[in-house]
């Protein structure tokens, strides 16, 4: 792991950095560098290096954000460059995609099966799956029932400490409880506090019956019991702040 150059593809020229200085919103922040990782190992190296150098990191997919979520004056990590794999499963009943895949192209891939993904944001032909998960995309047609949160089966993610987790593997729940015991205990404590407060429990249930993208997906504490499942669903709508 080369912490001085954590990624093969690093853009540092002024014109390159200016090209990534804004997204679809009105904000302008010029990144110190734009990194385009190809592997999980490079992402781990970026996270480790940023911690040592004390440089903030912002991950960006399609850059269709309207509120400045995908701009930074630190290191901008562009995952839309290389992470574009789309794989249909079970005759199109499920689809496994990387975060740089454009939503519209995923639907085009599924069209022959008569299927499409749940979220249908207006930016679907530009927005990428990573961003759609990060802001819990929905749309005019899918509503809440088929938003990103409710149509997620499993997710593979990297924590800021570099550890990799894959919720499609049944053994991961036990490993998560073992290696992330403190985090698990805190998640379960929050869940117990919510379940023990009838008015708060009712409020969370009511609030998430309609589109709600303010803050973290607190309904994860109500919908799931296993810490890894709670955490993985907190990632949906977390704007990349957790993993």
Where are these regions (language model features)?
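Short glycine-biased active-site loop of nucleotidyltransferases that positions the nucleotide triphosphate
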Residues: 25, 66-71
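N-terminal glycine-rich flavin-associated loop
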Residues: 25-57, 75-122, 133, 137-189
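N-terminal accessory segments
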Residues: 1-25, 30, 49-57
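Conserved phosphate/anionic-ligand binding catalytic regions in large, soluble enzymes, centered on
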Residues: 63-66, 132-140, 228-243
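C-terminal substrate-recognition/cap domain of FAD-linked oxidoreductases
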Residues: 11-20, 220-228, 232-243
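Polyanion-binding loop/helix "lid" in catalytic or ligand-binding cores
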Residues: 190-229, 233-234
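Beta-rich nucleic-acid/ligand-interaction surfaces
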Residues: 124-130
């Amino acid at each position: 792991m080369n912490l001085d150059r954590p990624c093969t593809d690093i853009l540092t020229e002024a014109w390159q950095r200016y090209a990534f200085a804004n997204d679809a919103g009105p904000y302008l922040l010029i990144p110190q560098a734009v990194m385009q990782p190809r592997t999980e190992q490079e992402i781990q190296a970026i996270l480790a290096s940023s911690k040592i150098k004390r440089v903030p990191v912002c991950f960006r997919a399609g850059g269709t954000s309207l509120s400045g979520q995908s701009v930074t004056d630190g290191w901008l990590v562009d995952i839309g460059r290389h992470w574009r794999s789309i794989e249909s499963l079970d005759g199109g009943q499920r689809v496994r995609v990387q975060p740089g895949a454009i939503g519209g192209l995923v639907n085009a891939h599924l069209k022959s099966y008569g299927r499409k993904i749940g979220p249908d944001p207006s930016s679907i032909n530009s927005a990428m799956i990573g961003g759609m998960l990060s802001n819990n995309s929905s749309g005019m047609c899918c509503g809440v029932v088929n938003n990103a949160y409710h149509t997620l089966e499993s997710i593979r993610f990297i924590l800021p400490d570099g550890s990799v987790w894959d919720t499609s593997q049944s053994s991961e729940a036990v490993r998560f409880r073992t290696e992330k015991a403190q985090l698990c205990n805190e998640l379960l404590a929050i869940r117990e506090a919510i379940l023990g407060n009838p008015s708060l429990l009712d409020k969370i249930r009511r609030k998430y019956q309609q589109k709600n993208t303010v803050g973290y997906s607190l309904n994860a504490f109500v919908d799931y019991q296993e810490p890894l499942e709670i955490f993985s669903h907190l990632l949906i709508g977390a704007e990349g702040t957790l993993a």
